[in-house]
Amino acid sequence: MDEKDVATQPQETGQNPRLSGQDEDPGRPEGAEAPPSEGALAPHARRSEAVGPKPPAPGGKLLSLKGDRAFQRLRKGRAGRGRYVSVKWLPAAELRVGIVVSKKVGKAVVRNKVKRRLREILRRLHLPQAHLLVVASPEAREADFAELFRDVVRALRKSGLVQ
């Protein structure tokens, strides 16, 4: 039988050789339950119903500092400066971080690399609860991870956030 012949042969009603039945799953053993059809998350993976922001887990994702007002408030915060970064912070109920890397640092790929490094450094430090702003200087593009790490710690010590 030719492929042309298959396409032109009349189909029996309700029968399509390419589609299986609605409840039919060839990979599922007979009698096994179908997965739940309520949304994209499985029951064990549903989001918790807890209210309010959760503090970042040690080694977890950092919360971002957002909104112009939050950045304006940080102008009155405590400051510290290193060779590659300057930091400002204010005490807060939770740790939130804003990272600023200007176009003077370089093109987008370089700026994003500096931001990723700074985010990882701050994640590793397990900082106290504060709103923290980290501004990278153009020289930060030449610093390797270890130099940047030492400089961030130095700036945070000068500002009084860490000992």
Swiss-Prot record:
One of its GO terms (biological process) is tRNA 5'-leader removal. Keywords: Endonuclease, Hydrolase, Nuclease, RNA-binding, tRNA processing. It is an enzyme of class 3 (hydrolase). Residues 1-68 are annotated as: Disordered. It comes from Thermus thermophilus (strain ATCC 27634 / DSM 579 / HB8). Belongs to the RnpA family. Transmembrane segments: none annotated. The gene is rnpA. This is Ribonuclease P protein component. It catalyses: Endonucleolytic cleavage of RNA, removing 5'-extranucleotides from tRNA precursor. The open reading frame (ORF) for this protein entirely encompasses the ORF for the 50S ribosomal protein L34 (rpmH). The two start codons are separated by four nucleotides. RNaseP catalyzes the removal of the 5'-leader sequence from pre-tRNA to produce the mature 5'-terminus. It can also cleave other RNA substrates such as 4.5S RNA. The protein component plays an auxiliary but essential role in vivo by binding to the 5'-leader sequence and broadening the substrate specificity of the ribozyme. It holds the Pfam family Ribonuclease_P.
